[in-house]
From Swiss-Prot:
It comes from Nitratiruptor sp. (strain SB155-2). Keywords: Ribonucleoprotein, Ribosomal protein, RNA-binding, rRNA-binding. This is Small ribosomal subunit protein uS5. With S4 and S12 plays an important role in translational accuracy. Residues 9-72 form the S5 DRBM domain. Coiled coil: none annotated. The N-terminal domain interacts with the head of the 30S subunit; the C-terminal domain interacts with the body and contacts protein S4. The interaction surface between S4 and S5 is involved in control of translational fidelity. Belongs to the universal ribosomal protein uS5 family. The gene is rpsE. One of its GO terms (biological process) is translation. The keyword Thylakoid does not apply. Disulfide bonds: none annotated. GO terms for cellular component: small ribosomal subunit.
Amino acid sequence: MEKWNREEFEEVVVNISRVTKVVKGGRRFRFSALVVVGDKKGHVGYGIGKAKEVPDAIKKAIDNAFKNITTVNIKGTTIAHDIEHKYNASKILLKPASQGTGVIAGGAARPVLELAGIQDILTKSLGSNNPATLVRATIEALERIKG
């Protein structure tokens, strides 16, 4: 496992959700955080953290994200070819775009692409909009791109 220099990476909190466990005495609340980290040079990762307080959940998610960093093949400011990928019920289509187009992406896919260092890309998300599955589908699609 590579040791990453955390100062070079940016972190984006994609989603924070409150989850509830119903027990005999009432409800127990916890927080779940989804974080994406990237250095804008072709390295990106995501992590999920759960804790009783939001800052603790975010810290755990960042730690998990650094354990899941992958390398993305970037061709100039975009990707090399079209790709379509499905993870669970989330499906994502990624298409290369000409320079100056920008990142055209919705929801949870945008921070993944921006933190990977991709500046020009067209995307379409189909199926489920669950942030966790959409982030994972986007990262898996980027991993499958051949240089």
